[in-house]
């Protein structure tokens, strides 16, 4: 009998009942809640005269709609947009009514859901984790089975602590070798998406493995698992090792004392067996990965920074040719245009993909001693949580950014999506550390280019895309 994958082990440990239709009832350990997908779920509970089944498994924070400017210090009443204000207020009221732990807008622990749960130790190895947000795959970096759910499922988890789901296939993405200097976790996952496409992981749980993955910090692993959904996989996973355990130890929600020792002992088994069989295998050589830049309107439209935008005339497939033509038109780019010739109007460093302390350090290293280019109208740095912000300020990173001409903001989802005041104007090009470059994602008509934090900072100070390794080596100014 073949061994089990990590996904198999997590699934089996949480399968309550297998149903006749092939689906299963799965127990949920951690439910993370934000202001956008929860109001209808709570209202559904009331209409059915139900209450949350287990209060202690829920943790909440507002993130999508909160302003990142000083206006938030005035409280909910200071939020200008009426819908945003109502959603944040409703989350507060629902959590207060049911006694759910919430890090409210001006709590230092507030932040993006996929940043605050890991930093609190609320995401633990071996858990099932769900949230009404597709980037819940982030938490798979801890060897947890994590994925996004819809609003009706949010209500179902609140009411029953279970979900009905069908088991997925197993995919292994193996990245071996040593990453070149200046190449990051973001570049790995963009390269993976560029290789297999946004549908490549459909129907799969995607486990990332190999020497290059093992060398990543937890921040890097979270970045990679965060974007597994952009490769079509609802679930991204990394096996548990000492890096995982060391990150979790001592955090507020982490086990303590004898329970900690028992937990660590059980977590050590959260790896795929040596003889486990995967349905799909994808392999990359880390040494061959270069800094990546998305050029089009899908994350799979991505290239190394030293390449040129594709020419639709060179594409034999008529459907793909049409897709390239539409993307070029929307993005305002020309066939065969060098990536390094793309000029930027705005830069955004933040989001649940890249707003942790390691990300801010990488960007600050590039920004230090330099100035935001004259053609860049705005360069935003938005920490993923109040605790990340405080840590960055203790390290003086805020001063580096401010002296370089960046704006230093309060935590939130910010310009990742046009649901708050931080957004692009039509026709503007933005170097963004977020995860999606769909049409209108950052604002109607906005043109998004996905990059790593270091690449975003490099674009900010040069005004166009540049191989960040040139700045690291000091050969460009």
Swiss-Prot record:
InterPro entries listed in its UniProt record: 3-IsopropMal_deHydase_lsu, Acnase/IPM_dHydase_lsu_aba_1/3, Acoase/IPM_deHydtase_lsu_aba, Aconitase_4Fe-4S_BS, Aconitase_4Fe-4S_dom, IPM_dehydratase_rel_enz, IPMI_cat
A GO term, aspect molecular function: 4 iron, 4 sulfur cluster binding
Co-factor(s): [4Fe-4S] cluster
Principal EC category: lyase
Source organism, top-level taxon: Bacteria
Reactions catalysed according to its record: (2R,3S)-3-isopropylmalate = (2S)-2-isopropylmalate
Pathway membership: Amino-acid biosynthesis; L-leucine biosynthesis; L-leucine from 3-methyl-2-oxobutanoate: step 2/4
Record's subunit section: Heterodimer of LeuC and LeuD.
Functional description taken from the UniProt entry: Catalyzes the isomerization between 2-isopropylmalate and 3-isopropylmalate, via the formation of 2-isopropylmaleate.
HAMAP family listed in its UniProt record: LeuC_type1
Name of this protein: 3-isopropylmalate dehydratase large subunit
Organism of provenance: Pseudomonas entomophila (strain L48)
Lineage, top ranks: Bacteria, Pseudomonadati, Pseudomonadota, Gammaproteobacteria, Pseudomonadales
Gene from which the chain derives: leuC
